[in-house]
Amino acid sequence: MKRPPNWFDLVKEIIKDFSDLDHQKRSFYGDEFFASSAAEMCAFALDDYTVDEWLETYYDKLPPRLRDDMTEFVEQAMELPGDSAYDTIEDCLYSPEWVKIRALATSLTEQLEHLPDPKES
């Protein structure tokens, strides 16, 4: 699969979406055609040439804290339980796992905001 030309911007947008509770609610309730479940959301975000491969590709060019936080984000996102682990969507969105992933994503969004695209450095 060919990497998207806007790979870095795509990664930033994916992480920003993970930090946004309202976006997640719209996604899960079907108001947006992003994902219909927590599992699909993770699969879309971590699939192909997005977050995990971007991290691997540019790992050595990233500041240490960002590198560590990105690694933790990818690991945590891949371990999120599927929707069947929760009684309701609200239980899912407010579970400790999802609260943690949103906090990580918020921190990453702030760190990535002014970071130049590593490929250009």
Features from the language model and the residues they span:
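Short terminal alpha-helical segments
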Residues: 1-50
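A generic alpha-helix propensity feature with a strong bias for hydrophobic helices
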Residues: 8, 66, 119-121
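Positions within ordered alpha-helical repeat solenoids
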Residues: 20, 79-82, 111-114
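Short, surface-exposed, charged/polar-biased interaction segments
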Residues: 32-36, 94, 98, 110, ...
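Amphipathic protein-protein interaction modules
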Residues: 50-107
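Structured alpha-helical bundle/scaffold domains in large eukaryotic membrane-trafficking regulators
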Residues: 85, 113-121
